[in-house]
Amino acid sequence: MSKKDYYEVLGLQKGASEQEIKRAYKRLAAKHHPDKNQGSKEAEEKFKEIKEAYEVLGDNEKRAMYDQYGHQAFEHGGGAGGFGGFGGGGFGGFEDIFSEMFGGGFGGGARRQRVVRGDDLRYDLEITLEEAVRGVKKDIRIRTLVQCDTCHGSGAEAGSKVETCPHCHGSGRVRRQQGFFMTETVCPSCHGTGKKIDKPCKSCHGDGRVEKTKNLSVTIPAGVDTGNQLRLSGEGAAGENGAPAGDLYVVIHVKDHDIFVRDGSNLYCEVPISFTMAALGGEIEVPTLDGRVKLKIPAETQTGKLFRVRGKGVTSARGGYAGDLICKVIIETPVSLNEEQKELLRKLEESLEGKGQHRPKHEGFFKGVKNFFDNLSK
């Protein structure tokens, strides 16, 4: 390890900002990189110094240790085996350093008991399109961890002694020095609880929490759509050691509808009409989520034509406006015709034969086909 002042190595003052440290490192590392200075031992050593300095100053925790104790902060405990938690002897000044940095984790005073917020939970809720559009209240059941009623979350039987774990001093975690770096793991003695219980509660086996089914009422606002999430604060799993519970996220899934397809705030549907109405025009009733409305079909309507019924879509969940209902006309071909009906259609067809103005798309299509093959033969 270099004994040079890390700030001097990077050409910085002690109060340099994180951005200044990062810029200095990038500039100097690029200048002294071995690939740019092949064969230069001096550049190689300089690059190592720069890298070492940045590994310390670029890490807020290591930088704080270095600012207070200099190189001494990293001179002890560097063996491959490290140390087994907080409490062992034989580390001299290194132990004192970490006691100050981490609140007495190596010997002296106890650290604050670990408090872990409960897990967030997810519940997938399926609702109908009508419920999504209008809003609805739903009752749901979830299986989750709740505070133990027997011990009130302490994890101990009544009158039982609860002590701070002597191995991790209540943190639930132990740190190990491995060479230049430090790792943190769950305390193997208390399994992360930070405490030692003389007589664990029989109901929760010392955890302070038990699994239970909860019944909840969820209010779904109008205008929600598939993928929307509702957060129920504090309805997730109970936290450890009396920590706050997590949240419950209700994820909305809207069922497919028999008539309507939703796209944002608009609703789409297909409306079948007879070919005579398409030719002559007329009026039909179309469904909406609020009932039926009348829709005028102009004469000479072609299949696939879209008609917009304004304001009959979905009101935005954020309020303010409603989408539209878009009706796509589908012209039905008559089926199960008797001979008399077929003869009438043949006469109609004969009366239209050769008159392109009655069938503009038909004539336009075959004219386009003829032009296509004429061009191929040239």
Swiss-Prot record:
GO terms for biological process: chaperone cofactor-dependent protein refolding; DNA replication; protein refolding; response to heat. It is found in: Cytoplasm. GO terms for cellular component: cytoplasm. Residues 5-70 form the J domain. It holds the Pfam family DnaJ_C. Keywords: Chaperone, Cytoplasm, DNA replication, Metal-binding, Repeat, Stress response, Zinc, Zinc-finger. InterPro entries: DnaJ, DnaJ_C, DnaJ_domain, DnaJ_domain_CS, HSP40/DnaJ_pept-bd, HSP_DnaJ_Cys-rich_dom, HSP_DnaJ_Cys-rich_dom_sf, J_dom_sf. Zn(2+) 1 binds at C148, C151, C201, C204. Its main location: cytoplasm. Participates actively in the response to hyperosmotic and heat shock by preventing the aggregation of stress-denatured proteins and by disaggregating proteins, also in an autonomous, DnaK-independent fashion. Unfolded proteins bind initially to DnaJ; upon interaction with the DnaJ-bound protein, DnaK hydrolyzes its bound ATP, resulting in the formation of a stable complex. GrpE releases ADP from DnaK; ATP binding to DnaK triggers the release of the substrate protein, thus completing the reaction cycle. This is Chaperone protein DnaJ. The gene is dnaJ.
